[in-house]
């Protein structure tokens, strides 16, 4: 039976999940996780406490409880459960109060709930990424913070969306396809925005595997075609002096982090 993990918050529980995943990923075992957001009342907290206690009785093991709860009265109820508590907010707030010389002013939903200008900027970035995905249009490319280039299925779309959702970066992306390979060059609209261009590449064998799952035994997915496209695109990157990274076996988070590090684009945290 897998060890039970609870992610609990009086907000979205995103913070508890992120911290909890980061910690648990250090251990080579699997866990069974349950996320419970918006625990905003004592009644709800007592329901969650009962779930934790029932889990302990059923499994004989204390559940791991990662939480980011602002209200002390709700937090105390979770503390009184049979779970092993990992309280991220309280762990860091008290030492910071000492260092800063001021008391914290806890507000529920402050981390991920602000409907302010920063939030609007993130929504604009997400809309931009979707409207300018896969070379749908180059009319608004001058408004991009970043333009990702690459062959089909190398990770352009997920990287663009992640950068927009996580960091508020307006990221367009443009594909190079089979028909481009005989005379591969940048469209004029991209040449005019060359400082914004960033390339993605991928191991041809891995690209072949990905394309096979999409269009099995087609010319598009053949290993030969994958090798041709990757080779031609990488040659163009070098010719045009476009920075690029290899996405093979890297998560979208890792790809985005490499892009930010290499481009120097400013992160906007929300």
Curated annotation (Swiss-Prot):
Family to which the UniProt record says this protein belongs: Belongs to the pyruvate, phosphate/water dikinase regulatory protein family. PSRP subfamily.
Name the Pfam families on file: Kinase-PPPase
Q: Which reaction does it catalyse?
A: [pyruvate, water dikinase] + ADP = [pyruvate, water dikinase]-phosphate + AMP + H(+); [pyruvate, water dikinase]-phosphate + phosphate + H(+) = [pyruvate, water dikinase] + diphosphate
User: Which source organism?
Assistant: Shewanella woodyi (strain ATCC 51908 / MS32)
Q: What are the GO MF terms of this UniProt record?
A: ADP binding; ATP binding; phosphotransferase activity, phosphate group as acceptor; protein serine/threonine kinase activity
Top-rank taxon, per record: Bacteria
Q: What is this protein called?
A: Putative phosphoenolpyruvate synthase regulatory protein
> Which keywords does this chain's UniProt record carry?
Kinase, Nucleotide-binding, Serine/threonine-protein kinase, Transferase
Which residues of the sequence carry a binding annotation for ADP? 150-157
Q: Describe the task this protein carries out.
A: Bifunctional serine/threonine kinase and phosphorylase involved in the regulation of the phosphoenolpyruvate synthase (PEPS) by catalyzing its phosphorylation/dephosphorylation.
Q: Per the UniProt record, which EC number(s) apply here?
A: 2.7.11.33, 2.7.4.28
Q: Which InterPro entries match?
A: Kinase-pyrophosphorylase, PSRP
């Amino acid at each position: 039976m897998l060890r039970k993990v609870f992610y609990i918050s009086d907000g979205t529980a995103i913070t508890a999940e992120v911290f909890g995943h980061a910690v648990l990923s250090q251990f080579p075992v699997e866990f069974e996780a349950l996320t419970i957001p918006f625990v905003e009342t004592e009644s709800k907290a007592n329901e969650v406490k009962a779930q934790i206690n029932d889990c302990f009785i059923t499994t004989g093991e204390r559940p791991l409880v990662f939480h980011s709860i602002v209200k002390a009265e709700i937090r105390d109820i979770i503390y009184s459960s049979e779970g092993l508590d990992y309280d991220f907010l309280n762990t860091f707030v008290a030492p910071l109060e000492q260092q800063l010389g001021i008391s914290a002013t806890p507000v529920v939903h402050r981390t991920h709930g602000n409907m302010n200008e920063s939030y609007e900027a993130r929504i604009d970035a997400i809309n931009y990424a979707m409207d300018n995905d896969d070379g749908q249009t180059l009319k608004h490319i001058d408004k991009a913070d970043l333009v990702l280039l690459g062959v089909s299925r190398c990770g352009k779309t997920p990287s663009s969306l992640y950068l927009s959702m996580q960091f508020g970066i307006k990221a367009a992306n443009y594909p190079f396809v089979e028909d481009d390979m005989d005379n591969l060059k940048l469209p004029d609209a991209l040449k005019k925005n060359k400082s914004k261009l960033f390339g993605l590449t991928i191991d041809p064998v891995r690209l072949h595997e990905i394309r096979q799952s999409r269009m099995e035994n087609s010319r598009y997915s053949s290993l030969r075609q994958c090798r041709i496209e990757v080779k031609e695109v990488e040659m163009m990157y070098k010719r045009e002096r476009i920075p690029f990274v290899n996405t093979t076996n890297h998560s979208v988070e890792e790809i985005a982090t490499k892009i930010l590090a290499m481009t120097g684009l400013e992160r906007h945290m929300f």
